[in-house]
């Protein structure tokens, strides 16, 4: 609820109000009437309602000339509303906005810096290549403006205009002005200039030598880092991460200067700082690493107290960094324990981090994690339980001692008998443990004893990889299974319906055991694999086995092929290749770090989807604008059935009975400009056009009713308060 004094002011203001109010329906006819009202407050209310309808997705572009008439005011709030309307249609309806370019040029010379800023920003958003002929002089003036707020906006406009016509931007020299802005005294200007140069470099790598610019301005970036806003810091830190230090002293200096930002409240700033530190960490001495690692560890711990979405991004980046520095967070294992209110995507990432963090030489830590994972495996979310079971086997394989592996095996066997829905995951994990300890017959007998009790394994096991592991176990330990042939026959009968991994495993198992099985089983599976399957790998493997069995020394040859044991599993955790890891470390905090897919060509062929009108003369653009407004003037007829009567009554009471297209001709005294030297002439026309506006005010374009508006007098004070920040 607003304060009492504001409510009293609003009550008094509404009590003595003479100007008619705008209803909440938002009909175009009523808005059009309000926009040309003789009362300033009514016009302002109509603009607000128009903006409201625009934000709701309604097309109010037919009100463009009526809205733009109200730009001639000293009320900063009203002018900002008009500019907000114009900017909304600048990209989608550029042919409309180009007609008001003279008004923007006039505002670009306004004494108020906020208005100058809005004018140059709006002009740069008009997606028409002809705008460059009119924006050159205002842009150069604002690039060297005395006010930093205007300069920081102007440097962004250069990148937008470069997208329209890069050749002309280079010819005009505004790119050079943008490079000179890197030496500006204001840190926000430096940050925006850097962002604009990066965008230009992405559009055309030959336009600017970004690497040399970064190298020559590292000191400026480091000085500006502590004085700019958080989003400007992200830009500067991202730029510093692209720089390779010359020696260990410079790398140490960069790390020391950015380390303070590890404690920033914005997680994006923290990740950008970590990226800079990781980039320079290999170049500094090993003795300094321990202190930096502690600070990095504290930063990651703080990220675990952020909202779940930010935690997810942080966990993905931690996963990359742990591969390079596995000892980074070994003492912070408990921070990554799953909480009851964590969303599923965070839970899955935390389990992966836990298994990677645990120290295999620390039995106590491994035992605590084993107990924690056992609890996770008894939860109700299928994906979470599946990942916890997989983590149990990964933990047993990572610790490597058979006594600890036996504990993991007992937990998995207990889970296997408890619930049918997790049999697939338990089967896969148990087979991984047996491959990790191939010589442990006791463990093999334990596992086979449980599987031996299954009467219909093809029904209990659902996934292809689980069936593949089960059939592999039949071939590896045939003596531990009773009625082996019937168990294999079940899979032969469903051979065609099985997937590729199960078919391949069944083929290899039968060939391996063909001496102890009946001959018809081998014949059947070879025929099925060569004639019935659509998997090329299975068919080729079956053809190879068939030819080997047809050779004179087939037994010894088949034994050589099948009796070799699979290598022992030493680690089931996925790892990046060295090349991919180095690329991902360079892209921390980006979308590449989330998908683990480095975007090596992100600076090559970056495409920009844009709505740019090119090759049109001013006369053509004016005709396009008139046709568009004319076609949309009565778009709401189908919904507002009484609109014709309302419009008739309204027009009878209006002082000016100009039509919509006539308003366009009177409002925009806009002649074609073929050269940038005619801009001063156009400025004069624009000022004269504004003076001739009939808005119920004096010849200066300021309504006489503005004196009754309490907000008008305070507009400049508010804008000055904002500008004092710069």
Curated annotation (Swiss-Prot):
The keyword Transport belongs to this UniProt entry's keyword annotation: yes
SUPFAM superfamilies: ARM repeat
InterPro entries, alphabetized: AP_beta, AP_complex_bsu_1_2_4, ARM-like, ARM-type_fold, Clathrin/coatomer_adapt-like_N
Gene Ontology MF terms: clathrin binding
UniProt xrefs under Gene3D superfamilies: Leucine-rich Repeat Variant
Membrane topology type: Peripheral membrane protein
One GO cellular component term noted in the UniProt record for this chain: AP-1 adaptor complex
Domain of life: Eukaryota
A Pfam short name: Adaptin_N
Gene Ontology BP terms: Golgi to vacuole transport; intracellular protein transport; vesicle targeting, trans-Golgi to endosome
Keyword terms, alphabetized: Cell membrane, Coated pit, Membrane, Protein transport, Transport
Record has rRNA-binding as a keyword: no
Protein family according to the UniProt entry: Belongs to the adaptor complexes large subunit family.
Subunit structure: Adaptor protein complex 1 (AP-1) is a heterotetramer composed of two large adaptins (gamma-type subunit APL4 and beta-type subunit APL2), a medium adaptin (mu-type subunit APM1) and a small adaptin (sigma-type subunit APS1). Interacts with CHC1. Interacts with APM2, probably forming an alternative AP-1-like complex.
Function in brief: Adaptins are components of the adaptor complexes which link clathrin to receptors in coated vesicles. Clathrin-associated protein complexes are believed to interact with the cytoplasmic tails of membrane proteins, leading to their selection and concentration. The AP-1 complex interacts directly with clathrin.
Additional observations: Present with 2690 molecules/cell in log phase SD medium.
Protein name: AP-1 complex subunit beta-1
Organism: Saccharomyces cerevisiae (strain ATCC 204508 / S288c)
């Amino acid at each position: 609820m607003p304060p009492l004094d504001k409510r009293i002011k609003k009550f008094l203001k509404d009590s003595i109000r003479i100007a008619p109010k705008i209803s909440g329906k938002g009909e175009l006819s009523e808005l059009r009437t309000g926009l040309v009202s003789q009362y300033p407050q009514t016009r302002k209310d109509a603009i607000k309602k128009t903006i409201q309808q625009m934000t709701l997705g309604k097309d109010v572009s037919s009100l463009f000339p009526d809205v733009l008439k109200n730009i001639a005011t000293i009320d900063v709030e009203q002018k900002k509303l008009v500019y907000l309307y114009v900017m909304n249609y600048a990209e989608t309806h550029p042919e409309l906005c180009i007609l008001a370019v003279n008004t923007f040029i006039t505002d670009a010379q306004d004494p108020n810096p906020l208005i100058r800023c809005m004018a140059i920003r709006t002009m740069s958003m008009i997606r028409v290549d002809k705008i460059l002929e009119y924006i050159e002089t205002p842009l150069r003036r604002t690039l060297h403006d005395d006010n930093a707020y205007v300069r920081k906006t102007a440097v962004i406009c250069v990148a937008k205009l470069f997208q329209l016509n890069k050749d002309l931007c280079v010819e005009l020299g505004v790119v050079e002005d943008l490079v000179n802005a890197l030496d500006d005294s204001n840190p926000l200007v430096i940050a925006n200039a850097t962002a604009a140069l990066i965008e230009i470099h992405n559009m055309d790598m030959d336009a600017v030598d970004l690497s040399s610019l970064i190298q020559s301005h590292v000191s400026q970036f480091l000085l500006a880092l502590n004085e700019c806003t958080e989003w400007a810091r992200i830009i500067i830190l991202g730029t510093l991460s692209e720089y390779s230090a010359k020696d260990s002293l410079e790398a140490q200096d960069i790390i020391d200067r950015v380390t303070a930002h590890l404690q920033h409240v914005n997680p994006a700033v923290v990740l950008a700082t970590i990226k800079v530190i990781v980039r320079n960490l290999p170049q500094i001495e090993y003795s300094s690493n321990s202190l930096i690692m502690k600070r990095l560890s504290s930063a990651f711990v703080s990220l675990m107290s952020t909202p779940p979405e930010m935690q997810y991004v942080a966990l993905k980046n931690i996963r990359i960094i742990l591969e390079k520095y596995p000892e980074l967070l070994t003492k912070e294992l408990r921070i990554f324990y799953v909480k009851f209110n964590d969303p599923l995507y965070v839970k899955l990432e935390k389990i992966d981090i836990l298994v990677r963090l645990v120290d295999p030489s620390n039995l106590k830590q491994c035992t605590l994690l084993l107990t924690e994972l056992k609890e996770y495996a008894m939860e109700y979310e299928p994906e979470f339980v599946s990942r916890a079971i997989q983590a149990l086997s990964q933990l047993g394989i990572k610790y490597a001692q058979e006594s600890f592996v036996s504990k993991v095996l007992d937990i998995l066997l207990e889970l296997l008998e408890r619930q049918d829905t997790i049999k697939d995951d338990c089967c896969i994990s148990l087979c991984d443990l047996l491959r990790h300890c191939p010589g442990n017959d006791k463990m093999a007998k334990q596992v086979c004893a449980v599987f031996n009790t299954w009467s219909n394994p093809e029904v209990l096991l659902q996934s292809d990889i689980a069936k593949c592991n089960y059939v592999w176990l039949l071939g590896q330990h045939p003596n531990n299974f009773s009625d082996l042939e019937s168990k294999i026959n079940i899979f032969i009968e469903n051979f065609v319906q099985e997937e590729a991994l199960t078919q391949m495993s069944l083929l290899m198992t039968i060939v391996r055991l063909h001496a102890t099985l009946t001959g018809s089983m081998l014949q059947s599976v070879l025929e099925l694999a060569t004639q019935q399957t659509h998997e090329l790998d299975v068919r080729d493997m079956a053809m190879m086995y068939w030819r080997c069995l047809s050779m004179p020394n087939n037994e010894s040859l088949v034994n050589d092929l099948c009796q070799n044991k699979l290598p022992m599993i030493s680690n089931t955790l996925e790892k990046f290749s060295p090349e991919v890891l180095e690329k991902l470390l360079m892209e921390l905090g980006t979308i590449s770090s989330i998908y683990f897919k480095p975007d090596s060509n992100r600076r090559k062929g970056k495409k920009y989807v844009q709505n740019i009108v090119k090759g049109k003369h001013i006369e053509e653009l004016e005709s396009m604008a008139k046709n568009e407004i004319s076609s949309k003037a009565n778009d709401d007829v189908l919904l507002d059935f009484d609109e014709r009567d309302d419009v008739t009554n309204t027009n009878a009471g209006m002082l000016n009975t100009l039509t919509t297209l006539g308003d366009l001709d009177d409002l925009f005294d806009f002649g074609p400009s073929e050269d940038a030297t005619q801009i001063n002439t156009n400025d004069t026309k624009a000022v004269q056009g504004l003076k001739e506006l009939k808005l119920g005010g004096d010849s200066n374009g300021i309504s006489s009713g503005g004196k009754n508006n309490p907000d008008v007098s305070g507009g400049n004070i508010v804008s000055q308060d904002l500008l004092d920040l710069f």
